[in-house]
A protein has these predicted regions:
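The beta1-alpha1 cofactor-binding region of Rossmann-like NAD(H)/NADP(H)-dependent oxidoreductases
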Residues: 90-91, 110-125
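Conserved mid-core segment of classical short-chain dehydrogenase/reductases
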Residues: 121, 143-154
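Glycine-rich phosphate-binding loop signature in dinucleotide/nucleotide-binding domains
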Residues: 127-132
């Protein structure tokens, strides 16, 4: 489907950031708040329409990247959300709280390492308690490892 604005076709190749991204080094897990330019996760652009009113979601990896975009979209669509993130990413989670304060949805922040089974159990338990149940799981948490050639990706 073409990118339309006022029923006029707009070539999408000119719509987004095109400059070379400067090399940036951070120790994992890294913070989105330290990236330049900042990734567009919908902070300014996404407008909700109430499509998820009354829903309750747990979003893993919701402090940055795609997970942050999902958290913003779900909250602006009316869902109450619980966001899991690594404790080292607290600054990104705090900025998400600041962004979504006053938007009308409940936001529960749940730090924890998903590689630990007990942490997983606690996160789910705390999300269910905080939101009075769950309707949706967005299992987005992951790590990024840059490789120069796709053949080296596993």
């Amino acid at each position: 489907m073409p990118n339309n604005r006022n029923n006029i076709f707009v070539d999408p190749r000119g719509e987004y950031y095109h400059d070379a991204y400067p090399a940036q080094q951070q120790e994992p897990p890294g913070l989105e708040s330290r990236m330049q330019p900042r990734p567009d996760t919908g902070e300014e652009s996404y407008r909700g329409h109430g499509r998820l009113l009354g829903r309750k979601a747990l979003i893993t990896g919701g402090d940055s990247g795609i997970g942050r975009a999902v958290a913003i979209a779900f909250a602006r669509e009316g869902a109450d959300i619980a966001v899991n993130y690594l404790p080292a990413e607290q600054p990104d989670a705090a900025s998400l709280r600041t962004l979504l304060d006053g938007e009308g949805s409940r936001l529960t922040l749940l730090p924890g390492d998903l590689s630990d089974e007990q942490s997983c159990r606690r996160i789910v338990r705390d999300a269910v308690r905080a939101l009075d149940g769950l309707d949706t799981l967005v299992l987005n948490a992951g790590t990024q490892h840059a490789v120069k050639e796709i053949a080296h990706l596993s």
